[in-house]
């Protein structure tokens, strides 16, 4: 919401998918009610959104692309690198919902073309109620605050920071990254047993 409302002058097109988490669906629907035009991509039979679908939907006036990395219900892993490649020469803001991906796929795989990525602690055994909005290094991505009343968090969100939750998030993130390879092997073994 904050990025679209800040940057939306003259560019009113958004691309997302019909199977996003409600944390993305509802804000995009709100932007649609505000007058933004939304192209809703439908998944294939395996629950994936392809880079070709994104390329077909992309327009000159596309302001924002918001797609998930790992689906919260199906577990499908989308081609974030493919999306980034499609968007290489486009000015659209690229947001990745990475909440389900953290601790399950290597974060080194986050392409530099990603402008924003959202994470939440409880998806990798951290505390509830704390998350991170990663802002990439590309210039020009600005966010207007949705809440007002203080200058905390660089003026984007008011209120005293919950240090205990931030430390809990950071500790859980470190543990998740340390255990990533081992957990992936274990889950792969379990998947093979299930298929047998």
What are these regions (language model features)?
Residues 1-196:
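Pyridoxal 5′-phosphate
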């Amino acid at each position: 919401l904050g990025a679209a409302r800040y940057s939306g002058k003259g560019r009113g097109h958004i691309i997302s998918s019909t199977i996003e988490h409600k944390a993305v669906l509802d804000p995009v629907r709100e932007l649609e009610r505000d007058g933004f035009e939304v192209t809703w991509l439908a998944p294939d039979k395996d629950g994936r959104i392809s880079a070709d679908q994104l390329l077909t939907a992309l327009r000159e006036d596309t302001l924002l692309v918001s797609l998930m990395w790992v689906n919260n219900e199906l577990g499908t892993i989308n081609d974030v690198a493919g999306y980034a490649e499609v968007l290489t020469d486009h000015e659209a803001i690229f947001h990745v919902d990475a909440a389900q991906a953290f601790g399950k796929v290597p974060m080194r795989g986050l392409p530099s073309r990603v402008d924003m990525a959202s994470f939440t602690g409880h998806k990798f055994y951290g505390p509830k109620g704390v998350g991170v909005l990663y802002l990439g290094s590309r210039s020009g991505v600005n966010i207007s605050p949705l809440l007002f009343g203080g200058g905390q968090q660089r003026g984007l969100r008011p209120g005293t920071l919950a240090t205990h939750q931030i430390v809990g998030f950071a500790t859980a993130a470190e543990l998740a990254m340390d255990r990533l390879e081992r957990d992936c092997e274990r889950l792969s073994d379990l998947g093979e047993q299930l298929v047998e």
